[in-house]
């Protein structure tokens, strides 16, 4: 009888102190960077995170191919974003930290770990290039150049509106505004809603978590990066070579390369009309980061001759 009571108490204690995750919970994610065990529970010990025990949000993976730290080190991160803690930047105080990035990335298997080392480095360079443009505090004559000032801002600059589109699926919460926040400057209730559901946070009622919680902030950007929204492929699939353009894409000059990622993000405003200073800014960040990571940028960096997929999912804030 004692043994039965002890086991029952243990089960109840486990249920109260852990969150279900993974295949046992419809793909739910663990909070706070915890690992999801093969049994569907969240934790941070070897029983949850170790080889053979972890089903998702695992630290790296088997061998170099799964180790994001082997693609971008802490020192490279600091070199790429070397003015993010400038006194003029909202992110000063190390809001955008390397540890927060690595923790957030662990929730998205495949991010920065797909393909050979060249593909993995290009993905990281492309991700930080696009998000650096969205958050840049640089100017043409800035110290160390304009492409050393990514990740300066947390929130959309100026006087943004509420970006609320009436929706029964993603209803706006009273008094909440869905302007651009975080590395990708996610905006609109119809993006905050599905992003929050995917990462296990109520962003419709708490949108400012994207600008106050470092890990959630990075997760919002990586969620957008990894998520296709038809007819657009995901940025991840484009940069890793998994996306194959259809006949419609080819007729629109949408071919694999960094330029299509710009088209995905803000093609309605930036692509299809020749040279655009915003597109060139994105390319400038990308070339710099490829240099730091030691990889070539590949082909098709511009989108000036591409027809857009349509309006961007994001509002261009810079």
Curated annotation (Swiss-Prot):
EC number: 3.2.1.14
Secretion signal, residue range per the UniProt entry: 1-18
Active site: 134 (proton donor)
Enzyme class: hydrolase
GO biological process, one term: cell wall macromolecule catabolic process
Propeptide stretch(es), residue numbers: 312-318
InterPro entries noted in UniProt: Chitin-bd_1, Chitin-binding_1_CS, Endochitinase-like_sf, Glyco_hydro_19, Glyco_hydro_19_cat, Lysozyme-like_dom_sf
GO cellular component term of the entry, any: vacuole
Subcellular location: Vacuole
UniProt induction comment: In response to infection, elicitor, ethylene, wounding.
Annotated transmembrane regions: none
Residue pairs linked by disulfide bridges in the UniProt entry: 21-36, 30-42, 35-49, 54-58, 89-152, 164-172, 271-303
Catalytic activity: Random endo-hydrolysis of N-acetyl-beta-D-glucosaminide (1->4)-beta-linkages in chitin and chitodextrins
Source superkingdom: Eukaryota
PANTHER family attached to this UniProt entry: BASIC 30 KDA ENDOCHITINASE, CHITINASE-RELATED
Function: Defense against chitin-containing fungal pathogens.
Stated name of the protein: Endochitinase 1
